[in-house]
Amino acid sequence: VSLAEAGGSRGETFTQRIARLCDTWVHAEGATATELAAQIRERRPHVLVDLMVQTRGAMQETIAQKPAPIIVNYLGCPCTSGGRTTDYALVDVGVLPPEARDVFSEARVYVDS
C-alpha cells in the first residue's frame, strides 16, 4: 500500500498511524500535479483511492492525469468527483440513495453502512 499526502503533515497521531501501515508514504507537499502523477505512476498501483475528491487540498489536477488504471472516490466528500477519470465511487444509501444514483459521474459501488 502506497499513500500520497499533498497537504503536508501536521504530525497528527492518526497520520502517523496510517503511515506505519503503508509500504510507501509519498510526501508530495510542494510537488506539481504532473510531478505527483509521475511519482504515483512509478509505483504502478492497480487502484488509486482519492480520499479528498472536492475538498480543500484535493488533487484534482493529479487525478485528471489518470496516474492509475482504476481510480476510486471514497470518504473525503459525499459527492461525485464530476470527472471522467474517476471510475468508481464507494457510497452507502445514506450518502447516495438509489433513486439519486444518476447524479454521480462514477459507477457506484454500494457498501454496507
Show where each model-derived region lies.
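A charged, well-structured terminal subsegment
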Residues: 101-113
